[in-house]
Amino acid sequence: MSFVALIPARAASIRLPDKPLADIAGKPMVVRVAERAALSGASLVCVATDDTRVERAVTEHGFPAVRTLSSHPTGTDRLAEAVRILGLPGDAIVVNVQGDEPLIEPTLIDGVAQLLADNPQADIATCACPLTDAQALFNPNVVKVVCGNDGRALYFSRAPIPWARDALAGGERMLAPGLPAWHHIGLYAYRVSFLQRFPTLAQGELERFESLEQLRAMEHGHTIVVSRISAAPAAGVDTPADLDRVRAIYLQAPKTEANQGLIQVQSDQGNDGR
């Protein structure tokens, strides 16, 4: 199986300006993400950015980059432009690796790519881990997914789904025992043929209300398959505190990017379960 890892990277960030360029043990964060992705089975790791500084930082460290428009409404639209620039064939598989996840496990990248390759009826593959506390279940910033027995996504929501009617009848906010609640992890593998169609798909009501772009694919009849993993992966970088945590992990790790094992052990200690 062959696939491409694409890393969208925008410098604009409200909570952490110039986030892709933030230094982590001597290298920009986007380069650290690319190094992690390069440890996967990807045949190509490429950054898609609308920022000259990000492009220069990436290429100076030996990774290719493509310049994309700054006007894209979603990250998926940016991926669609990137695959067009790269000239990827419609049957190719692309994994969207978020540019703020310098602790991402290479095996997770391989896993979603393999899942899509194994499910020819699907256009998208992603992953989810068990929800383990009520606070996360009721947190609208934690996206939930419910799946069929075949692993196909039935719905994604910011609401607490599935709803435990009897356990929550009194208005309590609790995680009902045995509730099959899953936290969606925002790592996606796409078929290029789907990415080529995505910009032409009209936004539907579900996407507008939930503000979840994967619902656009589902509203238009596209199949998403979900790998259910046992535990949450290391959290990404959203705040200055997150950045400090990741910097500490890298500074404690051996001076080789191949030693992903130690980085993962350290990251597990700082995982906030998102």
Curated annotation (Swiss-Prot):
Q: Name one GO biological process term.
A: lipopolysaccharide biosynthetic process
Give the first-level EC class, as a single word: transferase
Q: What is its EC number?
A: 2.7.7.38
Q: Which Pfam families match?
A: CTP_transf_3 (PF02348)
GO terms for CC? Answer: cytosol
Tell me where it resides.
Cytoplasm
Q: Which UniProt keywords apply?
A: Cytoplasm, Lipopolysaccharide biosynthesis, Nucleotidyltransferase, Transferase
Q: Which domain of life is it from?
A: Bacteria
Q: Which reaction does it catalyse?
A: 3-deoxy-alpha-D-manno-oct-2-ulosonate + CTP = CMP-3-deoxy-beta-D-manno-octulosonate + diphosphate
Name one molecular function that GO assigns to this entry: 3-deoxy-manno-octulosonate cytidylyltransferase activity
Q: In which pathway does it act?
A: Nucleotide-sugar biosynthesis; CMP-3-deoxy-D-manno-octulosonate biosynthesis; CMP-3-deoxy-D-manno-octulosonate from 3-deoxy-D-manno-octulosonate and CTP: step 1/1; Bacterial outer membrane biogenesis; lipopolysaccharide biosynthesis
The record's function comment reads: Activates KDO (a required 8-carbon sugar) for incorporation into bacterial lipopolysaccharide in Gram-negative bacteria.
Q: Which family does it belong to?
A: Belongs to the KdsB family.
Name of the protein: 3-deoxy-manno-octulosonate cytidylyltransferase
The organism of origin for this protein = Bordetella avium (strain 197N)
